[in-house]
């Protein structure tokens, strides 16, 4: 039979070998296989799912907006400190410095969520930024609708522009912010009072400071604010050579204005109310306001979409990292199991060689078994062919039956084969034969016929 060449060492799996091959190679090959196991699997990095361009775009845009918000917040705080006044709950809306500060702070917080979430790949901050931007747009839309409702509602009761202006007139002396707002409206819109077109200035009779009642102790009794005076009167007085004339003329224009007729005051103060000019101003810019709010949805949608895309990319990248970590754990466990198997092969090889060396040093047993001990033979008496005794009579049926019963009794008293003890020795065999011969001589056991 031709000699068969040994098979080459082939790996059945990355870093593993055939069991028979490893067993035949000895203790050196499994060690080399372990090196293959440890070096076959390299740490692979998952693919990059986060777009660097998108990430840094979101970061830069939100950083710029954050700096703008910081500037607006600083301006509001500066204005509030420069003209510090008592702050009430209504001043949150009426005080421009507080409004500017709140607006700047809101921009800072929202933009901080955006650029910090993009920088740190934080899904929670990115989603907070998108939600805040969307809610801010909803708030802008709601405020715009409120303004449209105020100026296009003619009811004197309830929330309307007429009600707000009357509230400002009644609380002119109690809130400095309201006083400044009313003065700015009357100077810029060239009006005085609220509602009436010809006699709007008479609405100041509802003010605690300017009413004409006998219980009013104020020096401004029956007057109107200085902002109701016409600019032409002040400018004419300012062009005079008398430096005291502008001050005197400004005092004369508003004093006792509520006691005079509109025709007597046309050259000194504005007589029409501020509601109609304010409504006309809003109507002229209503289209621009609506277009601005409508176009504002474009950058809002872009920022929300970009942020959500970035958040999904970060989430998918985390999923890939976790999946790769799980794969690495399974790979390490598999390599550990392979090392254990190879170690067991080494131990098996060492045990096989140790057994072979022990068998080589142990003396070889002889091929011929040792002789059995000699069997002692008891000399057997020869039976006489002819007996000198007289001829025996044939046994009767009763004697034969008694002999059969004794035979059955002796058979039942013997030990069953299943419960028999160890194999009988030669001496016991000889004794049994002698006992059988004695029984045969006494005719208790029938003799076998010789053919």
From Swiss-Prot:
One of its GO terms (molecular function) is protease binding. Pfam families: Tetraspanin. Disulfide bonds: none annotated. Glycans are attached at residues 205, 211. Residues 366-376 have a biased composition (Pro residues). The chain crosses the membrane at residues 57-77, 97-117, 131-151, 286-306. The gene is tsp-14. This is Tetraspanin-14. Keywords: Cell membrane, Cytoplasmic vesicle, Endosome, Glycoprotein, Membrane, Transmembrane, Transmembrane helix. Disruption phenotype: Viable and fertile. No effect on sup-17 localization in embryos. No effect on tsp-12 protein levels or subcellular localization. In a tsp-12 (ok236, ok269 or jj300) mutant background, exhibits vulva morphogenesis defects resulting in vulvaless or protruding vulva phenotype, impaired egg-laying with severe maternal effect embryonic lethality, smaller body size and reduced RAD-SMAD reporter expression, a reporter system for the sma-6/daf-4 BMP-like pathway. Males have severe tail defects including crumpled spicules, fused and shortened sensory rays and smaller fans. It comes from Caenorhabditis elegans. Residues 328-451 are annotated as: Disordered. Residues 1-56, 118-130, 307-451 are cytoplasmic. Belongs to the tetraspanin (TM4SF) family. It is found in: Cell membrane; Cytoplasmic vesicle membrane; Endosome membrane; Early endosome membrane. Expressed in the germline, particularly in sperm cells. Functions redundantly with tsp-12 to regulate cell surface levels of the BMP type II receptor daf-4 (but not BMP type I receptor sma-6), probably by regulating endosomal sorting and recycling of receptors, preventing their targeting to degradative lysosomes. Together with tsp-12, regulates cell fate specification in the postembryonic mesodermal M lineage, body size, male development and vulva development, probably by positively modulating BMP-like Sma/Mab signaling. Together with tsp-12 involved in maintaining the structural and functional integrity of the endosomal network. It is a multi-pass membrane protein. SUPFAM superfamilies: Tetraspanin.
